[in-house]
């Protein structure tokens, strides 16, 4: 088995929004309840890098870390209870070397664990900055265990596939 190597070529904010629907009437006398949703997506890109004669095979992927944070408060003056909704899609362009020699599991682990683990601190900083600019204390997201998230989704997909076989 060859050495797996993953490189990042670029990282960027693909989408960013902050909804502050009740701002003129909102007073944060209590700590809001924060609900965070995280999703990871990977899309294989066409193209190559390198010089002629380079025999090393690389596979390029755009990995998107989608984070949505919704802050809810209990305030009789605010009908829907929404303090803010902050959403970002933070992306990176990664290459995986020796792609053809890797198993599907090795590639998936690199893309869905390694990629978002690298991107998360940058996405967290963007969210903290944007929520602060919206007039709220900076939202500092807790670290995410992307390996546990990947394992849980893998088990769920296997369970769904086995259930489909019985129907």
Swiss-Prot record:
Protein's UniProt keywords contain Protease: no
A biological process term (GO) from this entry: protein tetramerization
Any one GO MF annotation of this record: unfolded protein binding
Pfam annotation, one family: SecB
Keywords assigned: Chaperone, Cytoplasm, Protein transport, Translocation, Transport
Disulfide bonds: none
Location of the protein in the cell: Cytoplasm
This protein's GO CC annotations: cytoplasm
Annotated function: One of the proteins required for the normal export of preproteins out of the cell cytoplasm. It is a molecular chaperone that binds to a subset of precursor proteins, maintaining them in a translocation-competent state. It also specifically binds to its receptor SecA.
HAMAP family: SecB
Family (UniProt): Belongs to the SecB family.
Subunit record text: Homotetramer, a dimer of dimers. One homotetramer interacts with 1 SecA dimer.
Protein name according to UniProt: Protein-export protein SecB
Gene that produces this protein: secB
């Amino acid at each position: 088995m060859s050495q797996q190597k993953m490189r990042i070529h670029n990282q960027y904010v693909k989408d960013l929004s902050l909804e502050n629907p009740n701002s003129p009437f909102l007073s944060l006398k209590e700590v809001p309840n924060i609900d965070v949703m995280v999703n990871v997506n990977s899309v294989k890109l066409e193209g190559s890098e390198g010089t002629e004669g380079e025999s090393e095979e690389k596979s390029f992927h755009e990995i998107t870390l989608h984070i949505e944070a919704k802050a809810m408060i209990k305030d009789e003056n605010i009908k829907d209870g929404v303090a803010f909704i902050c959403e970002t899609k933070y992306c990176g362009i990664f290459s995986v070397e020796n792609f053809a020699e890797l198993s599907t599991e090795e590639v998936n682990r690199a893309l869905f664990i390694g990629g978002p683990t690298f991107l998360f601190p940058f996405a967290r900083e963007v969210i903290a900055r944007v929520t602060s600019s919206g007039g709220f204390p900076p939202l500092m997201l807790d670290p995410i265990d992307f390996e546990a998230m990947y394992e849980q989704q893998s088990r769920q997909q296997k369970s769904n596939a086995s259930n489909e076989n019985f129907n």
